[in-house]
Amino acid sequence: MLASSPMLLFLLSLLMAYNFDTTAGQIGVCFGQMGNNIPNPSEVVAMFKQYSIPRMRMYGPNPDALNALRGSNIEFILDVPNGDLKRLADSQAEANTWVRDNVQKYNDVRFKYISVGNEVKPGEPGAAALIQAMQNIDRALSAAGLSNIKVSTTTFMGPSRNTYPPSRGRFKDEYRNFLQPVIGFLVNKRSPLLVNIYTYFGYMNRDVSLQFALLQPNSNNEFTDPNNQLRYLNFFDANLDSVYAALEKSGGGSLDVVVSESGWPTQGGPGASVPNAEAYVNNLRLHVNKNGSPKRQEAIETYIFAMFDEAPRQTSPNDEYEKYWGMFSPTTRQLKYGVKFN
């Protein structure tokens, strides 16, 4: 038969390689707006274009930013703020209005995901409303003819336990019960789970060496997972694969993970410096574009936190580093260190 021709199979394999989505690992950047000297949104979008940053995450609707994104071709994650969850869960009409005003109205913006909530924790106000809010937003998007926009939520490493070795990863009991319906929703909709992963905190807490946290080679923390013989050369991969293991144990083994935040501060804490931030961001950029993790050897969609330093983020004198995650100075609009985004 013709289909069994070696030459035809070879040509088909070339065609598949040509059409493979090579953009999956391209780096995006989170645009937070908590600072009191952040440039206006039109300037920020112009900077994304100037530096060829292909993706943006923003933590809530901002009409000026959404208007500036029109026609920009920047792929976009828009968050539903945690404070809106209960209102949107209680009323399908409210969810419809939210989608109409913040998504449907901007039909020339490349919405990719709607993240319903960011790092929602069990017992917090609105936590019980999370899954219903996700369902209502999803229904509103479908009714508006926008079912190509995926609905998800953003979690973090806090729900995970037994992350060493990664194959033992699982969710803490209180989070497993909380996340189970979310995971079921994501599996049904074939949407990814968004996860914030920061290797900096492992270094700050003295759990791992600086090299291992910065994705630098020949760290004394490198190890082989005894349960599957996968080799781990950096802390980022170990974190990510522990999430995949936890998802497998919770019925979410088919899910992809989007790393919705990762970064390194430039001052204010142990190991927080411009050279270390430069090393981390560049090592991460190369890694997620080429290698994937030992468990999932494919490009990893990743967003760097953050575009700018955000002075009001400090929560206590011990958290000075929280103000200094930005890659750009908000006053000079210049990069603090060298990095390419594509």
Curated annotation (Swiss-Prot):
Signal peptide: 1-26
Post-translational modification, as annotated: The N-terminus is blocked.
Cellular compartment(s): Vacuole
Top-level division of the source organism's lineage: Eukaryota
Keyword Mitochondrion: no
Gene Ontology molecular function: any one: glucan endo-1,3-beta-D-glucosidase activity
Cited PROSITE patterns: GLYCOSYL_HYDROL_F17
SUPFAM superfamilies associated with the record: (Trans)glycosidases (SSF51445)
Record's catalysed reaction(s): Hydrolysis of (1->3)-beta-D-glucosidic linkages in (1->3)-beta-D-glucans
Disulphide-bridged cysteine pairs: none
InterPro entries in alphabetical order: Glyco_hydro_17, Glyco_hydro_17_plant, Glycoside_hydrolase_SF
Enzyme Commission number(s) from the entry: 3.2.1.39
Family, similarity comment: Belongs to the glycosyl hydrolase 17 family.
Described function: Is thought to be an important plant defense-related product against fungal pathogens. Accumulation of the glucanase can be detected as early as 4 hours after inoculation.
Name this protein carries in UniProt: Glucan endo-1,3-beta-glucosidase
Naturally occurring in which organism (per UniProt): Brassica campestris
